[in-house]
């Protein structure tokens, strides 16, 4: 890259669904010679995770309003104003060429500060239903991108950036052809686990017996209780762990996955080429349902809403899927994936920097 080194500021915080896609784009652009800095909050996961990736991070003080009391609502304008002023100072000191908003509370004040400083804002919405912050920022953004169709009416669909080790997995036809033995069921409730999965899957294991074998991530603190549930069901032989560090290896092992349908999980399942049973988290805007719907429409997954997620319903589904069916579903999942999402988002950042 000739001339002045281009500078990007990534705004993302709160959850892995915002932070990990931001890191993927950051690393891609750093490899192209860009300088990258991060805007986050000091009390969320980005505070420790981002520096581990060799990226400096600045903090502003901001938190969400949903579920907060009246006093928090009344003082919100003051807190937002202060956060915007903090972000403006950071922008002036760093002087980024582009700001990339990947979601989380930090994106609101950060995006407004960038706009006030004349810095182009590129937004990426990871979910099938746009969050409040991104809906507001879309009015001032130079470019709006979405992972799934429908979050914004006219935004480009670019997918969600996912980890390179997941993208590097062999295609389903290579990975799954010739497999024999019990169906391998990977159960993921996210790093915090999901109680409904932990309660139900031991009963599914008991129902299907030797037809399946499970690798079950139960989440922090749930291992003793869930292990005991498997033992009481006479199913102590399954692999039950608190957390899976190498998700790519878990995807490579699995024939089918049972999980929530957070945006990043859905995108990773598609990129890996895996059939899925999705259990959307019951949020008022049904965000996770809309994330999972494209894969169900493609014939790659089934959505079971939480009230209907029982040992009987799950056992019936799994028992009806033979290996040929699972391979077909896996190939359909892969066909709707957008494996070059990282490159697509990065290209829009580069384009915004040139037209600034």
Swiss-Prot record:
Record's bilayer topology term: Peripheral membrane protein
Pathway involvement of the protein, from the record: Cell wall biogenesis; peptidoglycan biosynthesis
Single Gene Ontology MF annotation: undecaprenyldiphospho-muramoylpentapeptide beta-N-acetylglucosaminyltransferase activity
CDD domains recorded: GT28_MurG (cd03785)
InterPro entries: GlcNAc_MurG, Glyco_trans_28_C, GlycoTrans_28_N
GO biological process, one term: regulation of cell shape
Binding site for UDP-N-acetyl-alpha-D-glucosamine: 15-17, 127, 163, 191, 244, 263-268, 288
Pfam family for this entry, one: Glyco_tran_28_C
Reactions performed catalytically: di-trans,octa-cis-undecaprenyl diphospho-N-acetyl-alpha-D-muramoyl-L-alanyl-D-glutamyl-meso-2,6-diaminopimeloyl-D-alanyl-D-alanine + UDP-N-acetyl-alpha-D-glucosamine = di-trans,octa-cis-undecaprenyl diphospho-[N-acetyl-alpha-D-glucosaminyl-(1->4)]-N-acetyl-alpha-D-muramoyl-L-alanyl-D-glutamyl-meso-2,6-diaminopimeloyl-D-alanyl-D-alanine + UDP + H(+)
Places the protein is found: Cell inner membrane
A cellular component term, taken from the record's GO annotations: plasma membrane
Known EC number: 2.4.1.227
Keywords: Cell cycle, Cell division, Cell inner membrane, Cell membrane, Cell shape, Cell wall biogenesis/degradation, Glycosyltransferase, Membrane, Peptidoglycan synthesis, Transferase
Primary localisation category: membrane
Presence of the UniProt keyword Protein biosynthesis in the record: no
Enzyme superclass (EC): transferase
Record family assignment: Belongs to the glycosyltransferase 28 family. MurG subfamily.
Chain's role: Cell wall formation. Catalyzes the transfer of a GlcNAc subunit on undecaprenyl-pyrophosphoryl-MurNAc-pentapeptide (lipid intermediate I) to form undecaprenyl-pyrophosphoryl-MurNAc-(pentapeptide)GlcNAc (lipid intermediate II).
NCBIfam families in the record: murG (TIGR01133)
PANTHER family in UniProt: GLYCOSYLTRANSFERASE, UDP-N-ACETYLGLUCOSAMINE--N-ACETYLMURAMYL-(PENTAPEPTIDE) PYROPHOSPHORYL-UNDECAPRENOL N-ACETYLGLUCOSAMINE TRANSFERASE 1
Protein name in UniProt: UDP-N-acetylglucosamine--N-acetylmuramyl-(pentapeptide) pyrophosphoryl-undecaprenol N-acetylglucosamine transferase
Species this protein is from: Yersinia pseudotuberculosis serotype O:1b (strain IP 31758)
Gene name in the database record: murG
């Amino acid at each position: 890259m000739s001339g002045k080194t281009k500078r990007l500021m990534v705004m993302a915080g709160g959850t892995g669904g915002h932070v990990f896609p931001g890191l993927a784009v950051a690393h891609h652009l750093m490899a192209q010679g860009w300088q990258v800095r991060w805007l986050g909050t000091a009390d969320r996961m980005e505070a420790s995770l981002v520096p581990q990736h060799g990226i400096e991070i600045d903090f502003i003080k901001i938190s969400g309003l949903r579920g907060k009391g009246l006093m928090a609502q009344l003082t919100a304008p003051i807190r937002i104003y202060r956060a915007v002023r903090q972000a403006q100072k950071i922008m002036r000191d760093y002087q980024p060429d582009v700001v990339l908003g990947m979601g989380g509370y930090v994106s609101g004040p950060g995006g407004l500060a960038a706009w006030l400083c004349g810095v182009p804002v590129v937004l990426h919405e990871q979910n099938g239903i746009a969050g409040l912050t991104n809906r507001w920022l879309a009015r001032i953004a130079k470019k709006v991108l979405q992972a799934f169709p429908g979050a914004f009416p006219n935004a480009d669909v670019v997918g969600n950036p996912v980890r390179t080790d997941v993208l590097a997995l062999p295609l389903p036809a290579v990975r799954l052809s010739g497999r024999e033995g019990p169906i391998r069921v990977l159960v993921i409730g996210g790093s915090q686990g999901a109680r409904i999965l932990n309660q139900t899957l031991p009963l599914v294991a008991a129902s299907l017996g030797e037809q399946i074998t499970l690798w079950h991530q139960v989440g922090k603190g749930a291992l003793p209780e869930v292990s005991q549930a498997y033992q009481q069901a006479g199913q102590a032989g399954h692999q039950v762990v608190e957390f899976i560090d190498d998700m790519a290896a878990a995807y490579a092992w699995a024939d089918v996955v049972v999980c929530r349908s957070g945006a990043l999980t859905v995108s990773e399942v598609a990129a890996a080429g895996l059939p899925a049973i999705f259990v959307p988290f019951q949020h008022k805007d049904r965000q996770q349902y809309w994330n999972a719907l494209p894969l169900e429409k493609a014939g790659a997954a089934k959505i079971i809403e939480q009230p209907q997620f029982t040992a009987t319903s799950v056992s019936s589904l799994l028992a009806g899927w033979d290996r040929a069916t699972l391979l077909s579903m896996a190939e359909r999942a892969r066909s709707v994936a957008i494996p070059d999402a990282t490159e697509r988002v990065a290209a829009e950042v580069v384009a915004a920097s040139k037209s600034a």
